[in-house]
């Protein structure tokens, strides 16, 4: 399955909502930016709030009990958003956000160091995006990231193609080797088991149970209610 970042991304949002509810906080600030992250082909990732998918996969293959681990699903999101009225706010969408300008500011003010790629501050995500996605799924997420910079006029198409054609997704071969060893060790795999995983056929998230099954079933009804009665549950 392509989106092995789901458990981490889901947990971040779930516990943001839990703490917001506990302390009666009505707004959660999110660092998402439409101008740099607004485009993502559907086959590059999977629905992040797919609680049913996570639970089904864990029930089949999980070896560590989830215990009190909370997972955010579609219904949970609606409850937090509509009933508790806890809103996600995206401050960067209210600004003339220019990625290179923002990087220059945090370098100067906070001595920030460029990690060499989007989300590459995380070893797991760096290895996932820089190695697993290109080698197992033939997906280069830089295409999506660079496309948004082109759309927001922060980068030319020619410059983007130059990056894609001449720069490796990994900052260096040495770092790639270190991250690979780290990942294999943390996952409790042998190198042979890892290579077998990379070479095995990709399986869709939809092979397992999914919240999207409910969407598929209810979407015709929702479109009718929205058109005839102007009922907007998801807006």
Short names for language-model regions:
Residues 1-235:
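Nucleotide-activated chemistry modules centered on ATP-dependent adenylation/adenylyltransferase
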């Amino acid at each position: 399955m392509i989106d092995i970042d789901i458990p981490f991304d889901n947990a971040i949002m779930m516990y943001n909502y839990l703490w917001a509810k506990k302390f009666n906080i009505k707004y959660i600030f999110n660092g998402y930016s439409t101008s740099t992250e607004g485009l993502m082909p559907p086959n590059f990732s999977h629905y992040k709030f797919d609680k049913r998918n996570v639970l089904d996969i864990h029930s089949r293959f999980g070896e560590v009990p989830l215990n009190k681990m909370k997972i955010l699903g579609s219904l949970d999101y609606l409850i937090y958003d509509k009933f508790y009225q806890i809103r996600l706010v995206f401050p960067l969408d209210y600004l003339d956000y220019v990625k290179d300008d923002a990087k220059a500011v945090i370098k100067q003010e906070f001595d920030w160091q460029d990690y060499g790629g989007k989300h590459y501050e995380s070893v797991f995500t760096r290895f996932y995006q820089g190695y697993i996605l290109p080698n197992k799924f033939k997906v280069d997420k830089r295409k999506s990231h660079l496309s948004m910079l082109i759309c927001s006029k922060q980068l030319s198409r020619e410059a983007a193609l130059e990056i894609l054609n001449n720069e490796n997704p990994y900052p260096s071969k040495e770092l790639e080797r270190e991250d690979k060893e780290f990942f294999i060790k943390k996952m409790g795999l042998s190198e042979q088991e890892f290579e077998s995983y990379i070479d095995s056929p990709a399986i869709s998230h939809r092979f397992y149970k999914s919240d999207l099954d409910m969407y598929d079933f209810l979407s015709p009804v929702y479109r009718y209610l929205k058109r005839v009665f102007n009922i907007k549950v998801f807006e």
